[in-house]
Amino acid sequence: MSQQTTIRKLAELVNTPVDKLLVQLAEAGMKFSGPDQVVTSTEKMKLLGFLRRTHGKAETPAEAASEAAKKITLNRRKLQEVTVSAGRTKTTVNVEVRQKRTYVKSENEGSGRATPMTPDEERADILAKLAASRQRNLDEQQRLAESDRVRDEEIQRKRDEEQAAKDRAEAERKAAEEAAAAASAPAPAPVAAAPTPSAAAPAARAPSSPSSAPRPSRPGGASPASRPSTPARPDDRNNAAKHKTRGSHVMVAGVEDDDATKRFAGQLHLSAADRARRSNVRGKPTGRPGSSSSRRGNDNGRGSNQANSGPHGFERPTAPVVREVAIGETITVADLAQKLALKGGDVVKALFKMGVMATITQSIDHDTAALVTEELGHKAVRADNADFEDALLAHAEDAQGDTTTRPPVVTIMGHVDHGKTSLLDYIRRTKIASGEAGGITQHIGAYHVETDRGVISFLDTPGHAAFTSMRARGAKITDIVVLVVAADDGVMPQTKEAVAHAKAAGVPLIVAVNKIDKAGADPLRVKNELLAENVVAEDFGGDTQFIEVSAKVGTGVDTLLDAISLQAEVLELKAVAEGRASGTVIESSLDKGRGPVATVLVQQGALKRGDYLVCGIQYGRVRALFDETGHQPGSAGPSIPVQVLGLSGVPEAGDDFVVVDDERLAKDVAQQRETKRRESRLVASATNRMEDILAQMGKGEGQQVLNLVIKADVQGSVEALKQSLVALSNEDIRINVIHSGVGGITESDANSAAASKATIIGFNVRADASARKIVESNGVDLRYFSIIYDVIDQVKQVASGLLGVEIREEIMGIAQVRDVFRSSKFGAVAGCMIIEGVVKRSKPIRVLRDSVVVFEGELESLRRFKENVDEVRNGNECGIGVKAYNDVKAGDQIECFERIEVARTL
């Protein structure tokens, strides 16, 4: 291969155009006719030296190294603090100053000495330089000490002069006060004030001064000097004496300068003393312009009014300031910091020390805020935010009037399928149970029935375990509880729960033993079982009425109604029949054609169409009233359930309602309640999020989450579904209801489910067209239900699918090693006796020595009578070769096991 390099090849090597390379060669003094000419190594080095000189570098690497040895670069970093003013506060900022300096050693420095110095000479030179440096430092210290001494002497001299001036001014002030006190004696006419010794010279020149000459009298009035003036008060004379002394001039009573005349124009009725006093109040001296008094006020450079004024407006507190902070139900950290006059970070830091992790924008409850306030040294008081609630209470008190007897409110309670709704059907002579999905009641039904014994309002509550809150709500608003117990089934869990609700509400109990017409009915068993729940029948010496009835044939229904009427008479139920109405929401729903619908039970007053009412966090005007038959009554009195249309939203079941005079008050009360509820919910959600984070930190990634969106026809069903499904959560899976509501499944519900990968549960509702489109496009799991049993079962199945499978180990057999043989093919072979179960060649094994696992692996061979077998059962001998393990000893046990997958369930 030729070592010659052409210009073209060199241009390719250095990645430079051929024309440019030819130009550079020509500039370097080398002529070439074309790109195909050969370039020698000498010419290459010559070109390289030319290019280095052009760029300001050494021609050769040796020269570059020599130049680098003559240079030294020093980098210096210095940290310092700079104070920056930010408004009224000052902030300290850390600043890093970086300096870079390059020193070049000149050629004559190295050539200044022909021969290098000996070590002794170098040591002497270093000592001489050190002594010179020490002398320079000593001289500098002496110079600084001398300048400090001169400065201190100058400061001390100025302080002495200022103190002497203050002493002279104090002596002059005391002399002036004594002279003013002597001149304050009653005199027949005002006379000129006696000049003090210090003011003698200016007083002698006073007549020649044109500004001190008396002015001619003003037209239309006497001159101030000739007008009688009121006697000046002692303090006014003292002030005037001060100004006379400090101003070093004499003021004659009634003679004023031009500046004073301008200032008091239109106030000629004032005396000289009053003018002097007002001048002092305004902070301006009463002396003539140009005098020392008007120029500098007093010897200290301050106005004379400051000498007589009280303390200044702000004094730095010497003790910690304890503030009284008003805190509501919730408060944000930023608002609390503002009330405490602290930075938000300080409050957040105090919360962290107390174990509460919160940001500056997060809301905290009253107890936490009170604790951190006391921790910071201040006092916390509860803020009174019940302004609108007080107005609402005043409205309720105004509605008091004459009371009349009202119908009783009777709640039918009991276990599921014990015949509660069927009994009410017979009383109403209608069929209601057939209209309920699955034949069970899934929301509170409110009815009022006119019987021969008067009007009775009935509330039919669900008996399923999921509707605990509904039954508790029904017990709170009722007067009498009728406990329905099937004679053939006895006391069940929801029966006991209903008894507990009735006792907690303090409501009298009447037991209706239903299904008495069936063959297996045993009323005595029911009485004995209820006796364990402290419900004692009258024939057992108790006070509870037991009525045997049959909802199918009507046996004992009249006796039950008589018992209800008798109990109502004993209770003497009364209420105000006229005036503003108030009561409780029994159930609520969202009707697509009518809007929010609330079933309410009126407890006081009369509810009429057009009334403004507040219902929890909702408000509105009553547009229409409907009873359980669909008719529109003119009004609803006490103990009458009706449906109300016209609210701003769907209220929660169990909320109280009250009628107010105007819509403004109703809106204010509803908004205040909503604000409080939202703040409380934020505090609770923040706490739950923190608990979830801590729980996840402790559990790792083991817990699965199933997100749900629940929509139902009525509020009570939503509440029951949420409680029942969330209760399915355990340490392995968590049921999370991300959204719930009343009404059909809308587009926003579908979007929310798609974003969070949630399952939509529609209970007696359906999805609209837009929601179905989103569900289909995003693959959202949408399920419709009408019976609460099915909802719970389906969610259990879905949750169990998320749990996956559990791997379990099952021991199949155990072999006892009796002796160990050696094999050229397998190594150590254990002669064993199967003492338990069966040993299979395809299963994994463990080797146990003294009941301790020493090896885990698999079998390499399993033989019986020199034949390979797949398994050996209990009581037989065999030879076992363990794969990759030769340390088998007599007395060991070989355990054969298998791994099986078990589906996990809730």
UniProtKB/Swiss-Prot annotation:
This is Translation initiation factor IF-2. Residues 514-517 are annotated as: G4. Belongs to the TRAFAC class translation factor GTPase superfamily. Classic translation factor GTPase family. IF-2 subfamily. Residues 136-177 have a biased composition (Basic and acidic residues). Residues 405-574 form the tr-type G domain. CDD domains: IF2_eIF5B (cd01887), IF2_mtIF2_II (cd03702), mtIF2_IVc (cd03692). Residues 460-463 are annotated as: G3. GO terms for molecular function: GTP binding; GTPase activity; guanosine tetraphosphate binding; translation initiation factor activity. Gene3D superfamilies: P-loop containing nucleotide triphosphate hydrolases, Putative DNA-binding domain, N-terminal subdomain of bacterial translation initiation factor IF2, Translation factors, Translation initiation factor IF- 2, domain 3. Residues 134-250, 269-317 are annotated as: Disordered. GTP binds at residues 414-421, 460-464, 514-517. GO terms for cellular component: cytosol. The gene is infB.
